[in-house]
């Protein structure tokens, strides 16, 4: 299974929807709360090319984007193959 990382906040509805979508696929994302950790928020922005909105999702270290991008991947049939790949490293 893929390694999925998600930067989120506790009160973000899009974060909750992204987490629910991933869980429906059998994936428990490694979630980092950036509303309580400013160092992690800065790291998220660096990894996400300056994007500051949440969620920011990474699969096997590759930046996917936010919930809209995750949902679009799923609707196009491209999310499941990504999630089936073995985590690298």
PLM regions and their residue ranges:
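Compositionally biased, disordered extreme N-termini, encompassing classical targeting presequences
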Residues: 1-3, 84-89
